[in-house]
Amino acid sequence: MQAAEAAAQWEQGTITAEGFGTPPMGTYGSKASIMARRAAIVDAQRNLAEQVSGVQVDAETTVENYVISSDLVKTKVSALIKGAVVVEEQMMPDGAYRVVMSMPMYGTQGLASAIMPAIRDNTPPTPPPPVISATITAEITTQVQTRGVGYTGVIVDAGGMGLKPSFSPVIYDTNGRAIYGVSNINYDQAISQGMVGYSSSVSSAQALPRAGRSPLVVKAVQVRGGNNSTNPVNVVVSVDDGDRIL
């Protein structure tokens, strides 16, 4: 048995996991390969579940926290994992079987469909905020309507700062004002494509459809956690840039 791998690819919007299986003793031929493949799928689903549990929702919570606290989320997440598809498979020379399985982060069959409604239900009501749709690059990219200036989106350049992707990040200014967060989003859009998009560079963020033709590009001052966490999933911009976004 080999060590299996699993990973969340935020830029691609997928979660993948590798699984290995061996046939039971005394089985041969096609029956052995079928049983080895079945075992590999079970192993991949188990690794996928572990990876999904560790996905950061915000600075202080992971998917696992929601699964533990909500039977509805647990049931939805379990169904999504079982619905993952085999995207790569291979019979090994020793008779073992290897598969790679993938599930989407977004869309009606994606992890967001289980998590975003739970985020909404756990978000206290607030006065109607400015409508913002953004893109962050890890750089963060968001689609934001900004004060009639004509910007089609916002790109926050947080490259080299150790930004950790999450489902529900917040953009703050240096005065601690929340510029963008769950209060600003359209939940259907967040399920279909995420609150923000993550890219490896500003140039790749500018190519994202959500950024539009004329995005506002601002440089993050730093990354930060939440009130009770140091997980660097949120970005901080200057007060002036915060005003430009709003």
Residue locations for each model-derived region?
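Domain-level marker for long, solvent-exposed, non-transmembrane regions
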Residues: 1-246
